[in-house]
Amino acid sequence: NFVSVMATENNTQVDFSDLPPGIIIENNTPTSVVLNYGESYVIALNPAAAPANRDGLVGALVSATKPIVVNCGSSNGSNSTGNGRDFGIDQIAPFETISIDGQSYSEYIFVRANGYDDIERPLIVAHLDNTAVYVNGDDTTGTLLVNLSAGEYISIDGTYFSNQSVSGSNPGGNMYVWTSKTAFAYQGIGGSSNEANQELFFVPPMNCKTPKTINNIPLIQNTGTGSVAFLGGITIVSEVGASVLVNGAATTALPQTVNGNPNFETYLVSGLSGNVSV
């Protein structure tokens, strides 16, 4: 598990804080550093070194005196209790970016892929104390899961996704999550029913400024070769009644209603290759 940062300006002070007791940082790397333009720095935890290392960076606070680039994730991680592992890495946005002017809460809609419930799990990380997390509705209509303090997190069970099947795997199901204060979100997904084929990515909150066009996603199928090759797929969240075009043509994927927010619907479009636009 790791967090990497890169400075965009000289003399940038970077601090890593809110780290739990009991962790062992690789190479005893200091948790405070000054970087110049283009320099990078990594804090890493080996889960085999200490039990606290398994989730010791989830909820850690990265702060800097000047703008930085931050990537985080795991090179050998899993949501599953099985032995399968895989990479899960993404670039994240700062708190100021995910905060919405005039709005104290966050809304998220997650769309599941091809994994089972223990792999298909949203991860909510609180940035502020007293952050209540609800599923399938807000603080009036939803189910309260937990009240988090700053730096705490919840990994939401995949059974909360809509349209569950007997096997626990139903690609395209969705989940609406509402947090009483601005919070960060990540999503674990599965490329197949094999627990080793999983991924983790950063999820931005719902925002009226979200772009209507994504052009393009290059060579979407190029994620592996041989026995681990996948056809490309995308998940889409749109307003109800929107015309959804994939590569200029109306998608044949069926929309799924969102339990907890009837103004939106979701799609899972699979079997794609080449460059993709939405």
Which residues does each PLM region occupy?
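Conserved functional hotspot residues at active sites or interaction interfaces
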Residues: 1-59, 63-277
